[in-house]
């Protein structure tokens, strides 16, 4: 076994498709696949044409910078273990 497909393998796969899906449904499936690929290609091309325009747009800075929030209370002081046992 060399791991490659020969023409007999491809013929068997084609026959399986005909048996599983039927001869009437195969052309419809191929048409649907072709339409899907066409739509996919057009979307990819559209995204490639939009990408340079999106990168060229200037980035606007926010109008107002808010100061950092102040903590509501001072952090708690650690309790000494010796003082905690005597209480």
Swiss-Prot record:
Disulfide bonds: none annotated. Pfam families: TatA_B_E. Keywords: Cell membrane, Membrane, Protein transport, Translocation, Transmembrane, Transmembrane helix, Transport. Residues 52-87 have a biased composition (Low complexity). It is a single-pass membrane protein. Residues 47-87 are annotated as: Disordered. InterPro entries: TatA/B/E, TatA/E. It is found in: Cell membrane. One of its GO terms (cellular component) is TAT protein transport complex. The chain crosses the membrane at residues 3-23. One of its GO terms (biological process) is protein transport by the Tat complex. GO terms for molecular function: protein transmembrane transporter activity. Part of the twin-arginine translocation (Tat) system that transports large folded proteins containing a characteristic twin-arginine motif in their signal peptide across membranes. TatA could form the protein-conducting channel of the Tat system. The Tat system comprises two distinct complexes: a TatABC complex, containing multiple copies of TatA, TatB and TatC subunits, and a separate TatA complex, containing only TatA subunits. Substrates initially bind to the TatABC complex, which probably triggers association of the separate TatA complex to form the active translocon. Belongs to the TatA/E family. HAMAP family: TatA_E. This is Sec-independent protein translocase protein TatA. It comes from Nocardia farcinica (strain IFM 10152). The lineage of its organism: Bacteria, Bacillati, Actinomycetota, Actinomycetes, Mycobacteriales.
């Amino acid at each position: 076994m060399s791991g490659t497909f020969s023409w007999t393998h491809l013929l068997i796969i084609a026959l399986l498709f005909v048996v599983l899906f039927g001869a009437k449904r195969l052309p419809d499936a191929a048409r649907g696949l072709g339409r899907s690929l066409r739509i996919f290609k057009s979307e990819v091309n559209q995204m490639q044409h939009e990408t340079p325009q999106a990168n060229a747009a200037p980035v606007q800075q926010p109008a107002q910078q808010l100061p950092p929030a102040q903590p509501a209370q001072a952090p708690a002081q650690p309790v000494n273990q010796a003082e905690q046992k005597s209480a």
